Amino acid sequence: IGAAGIDGAGASTLKDDVFAAVAYCPINNLGNADAGYEWEYGAVRSDANTPALGGVAYSAGAQKAASAEIAATFPAYLDGLGLGVTSSTLAAAVTAQLKEEIERQIAKGTAVPQLGGSFTTARATLPNDWLTLTGTGTSAKVANIDYGKFVAYVAANQQLKSVVAFDAVGVTGNPNISGETNLFGSAASRYANFTAWSWNHNTVAGDASGQDDTGQDWAAYTASSSNTLARQIKLINPIAYLNTSADAAPYWYVRHGMVDRDTAFAMQETLYQAIKKDPSVKDVSFKLPYLVGHSGNYDVQEAFAWIKAKLDANP
């Protein structure tokens, strides 16, 4: 901020209050994002929609077993948050968001295909085998959404991330250092694994990450005061601060495209539920925009109208 933000004694003269947050496909809660991704997509993964790693197909290598192991950790995590949505109701909560968005589009005159018709996105034209409508024209309503088939449709529209989706380095044959893994580490390391599964399965010798190099499993390493990894993970996770004594921004505008597979719907719904429950939050606008992929600023008029309305209400 510089000199303009401090007084003569060096103390800050600026507030750090955040009035509102506007977020498009927020990649959030990285410590649990892999678990949410595999919980969401593991059942529909195949060689057709999941990249091979090191020339080894999804079904033939380590990815398939890893997906199942990682997915199995998500229900206990979600259920332990106490948000009111659980692993047994999460799919229904996302389905309700889909229904709301689709009916909103129909009322605006958007041509939404009947069952057996086709959806066309910027990437593909694929059959509608998951959405059943009743009625016609702008008065049509959603009669049924087959959530499992919807998830498979999203994976067919754009190939999924490989396993592991976020904490990818040094595991399941992935040679690449992900952008997420680069976010963590220390002065002595280029990166650090940031989930228990990837830490405990890292097989790259000499990268200073994982049990193989540190001699400590995930639980022991993150409990140690000799490193800051656990703190780093917490600092970039809004779930760790919502519904606590922290003072959250009062207004939130969150969008995640209806065909965006860059993170799981499970993670965005979890974020939405946490925001909605926080007593500091006055309003949250959350949508899954119709047939939108991984992008932002596609609704500038709507977003700025929302911002203006909040500013006008708080002169």
Q: Which residue stretches match the model-derived regions?
A:
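Long, low-complexity, polar/charged, intrinsically disordered or flexibly structured peripheral segments
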Residues: A92-L235
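Surface-exposed intrinsically disordered loops and tails
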Residues: G5-G10, A33, E40-K64, L83-V85, ...
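Surface-exposed acidic, glycine-flexible loop patches that form ligand/cofactor-binding
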Residues: A9-K15, A240-D247, K310-P315
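Primarily recognizes the serine-hydrolase "nucleophile elbow" in alpha/beta-hydrolase
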Residues: I1-V44, I233
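Accessory recognition modules or surfaces
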Residues: R231-A249, G296-F304
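C-terminal catalytic histidine-bearing segment of alpha/beta-hydrolase fold enzymes
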Residues: Y24, N32-A43, A68-K141, R255-D260, ...
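Catalytic His-Asp charge-relay segment
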Residues: A20, A249-G257
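Well-ordered, non-membrane alpha-helical segments in soluble/globular domains
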Residues: Q232-I236, A266-Q273
